[in-house]
């Protein structure tokens, strides 16, 4: 997803809910003030489809997680927020192994903003998204590798920054507006872009 929750595009919601029954959602986030009420925004669109939804919210920056306790997730959501904090928290081999394992089991994985960015092999961090106000290219989880993504493209007016970043990485950076998304297969190939 290119922006923040909730998902407002019904096409995206319908693709997710029609693909499999969702009984358990696991949300990975990082600590920030008032984080708990915000988590409902990630799941509210699914509540009407699946009223008995079981949801777990995990903060890897403040707690140790046994990933084996979350192997029953049908939908994994990686939240948004401070991109560099998300990268420092989630870009590691253990989390990558968990995500790849869950994709191979058929779970759906959704990243919002920072959570979408870190799914790539490389991560484009816009100058609008860090305190140094510089273009940064960081390592990601490697779920996809043929391209990078730019989030909040429209609201950040990020075209010039994205174009400069493409010259640095010599690979396409796909722009995602706040209510856009890319649908990928489990190998990271693009199935569809929904605007």
Language-model segment annotations:
Residues 2-6, 54-58, 85-89, 128, ...:
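Short, flexible loop segments at the rims of nucleotide/cofactor-binding pockets, characterized by
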Residues 5, 32, 82, 116, ...:
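Short, glycine/serine-rich, charged loops/turns that create anion-binding
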Residues 28-32, 55-69, 78-107:
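Non-catalytic interaction surface on structured domains
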Residues 75-80, 143:
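Short, basic/glycine-rich phosphate-binding loops at helix/coil junctions
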